[in-house]
């Protein structure tokens, strides 16, 4: 049987290849530190050769991506004033090529293939961690936690969060049945187990918040587009007031206490303070992309020692915005935040304006997860990370024009509601039709 090369780059027609490529990409993102450069080359080999099949279709119009590449280009430019220019050059090029791969995936992968690939990839990553993982002692809070095959429980927790979210999206948004419904259920249970064993409060709280938000948006989008915005605004105002009331009532300390944390977030607030002080050294353009946490630099060495980081690597300020302003200054912070905010609110706008759009529903949840985690992690700031891959995938989808469909009923009279991602074909008789 001959398979057309064009089917490799046609969304929906390349499902098998797309699932394989996404699953292997996630494995590389998770464990490239273990398997080295060979795994990175395999990642490039999955996406870059697709350009040779049909470069116009795969690359699209890069003029529409200028706002997406703005931070990436600026990160590369920081080599001219970087405290570690060779490191900034290497990591800047890596980040740029990583963004290109994410945009190629965006052009060639549809939302159902993305969801299935993420489920498969998360399951493989978590199974590997269960088979070859270890426990880690945290000297700051005096506890042991399962970190899997990662260096941090928060990374294990992030992949578990993705497994839970995409399993939820597969069943409740895309309406998967049969084999993939079972796969989503199994992957979701595996991810939930890993999330609990990791004891990552960040991942547990953000996962619960995003799932709750998506359920709320699922209810809002059951209305016609004209009514959604008013209900969303009302719900947002109510949620904001409730959040403020909870903070003043001590609800935050109560929640943190349930996870064995205090108001310092296990030293995060001290790290944030140190990051803000470091940003004052070069507030406009920063010290250079990836040029702060460098062995031999006094401030980095001091913080590694204070937080018992014996490897003297893989550490950060646990806040995307602070990390960005330290490395790339206010200019870089604005450019990166522009991509993150546009990805989140752009998908939200589509969700509130269009009829039953499963792609926007799934990507809105992805944007929400990355946006919330940005305040406590740096998932989108480094190359070969699943967070940055998903960010640019989500942002890139906004550059593809949408075909406006005629307004339809939510579901025909006398029939059960369809899953969120399913639509009714034209053969369904209209009410009163005699055929």
Swiss-Prot record:
InterPro entries: O-antigen_ligase-rel_domated (IPR007016), WaaL-like (IPR051533). Keywords: Cell membrane, Exopolysaccharide synthesis, Membrane, Plasmid, Transmembrane, Transmembrane helix. Pathway: Glycan metabolism; exopolysaccharide biosynthesis. The keyword Membrane applies. GO terms for cellular component: plasma membrane. The keyword Signal does not apply. It is found in: Cell membrane. The chain crosses the membrane at residues 11-31, 35-55, 65-85, 117-137, 156-176, 178-198, 203-223, 230-250, 325-345, 361-381. It is a multi-pass membrane protein. One of its GO terms (biological process) is polysaccharide biosynthetic process. Involved in the production of exopolysaccharide. This is Exopolysaccharide production protein ExoQ.
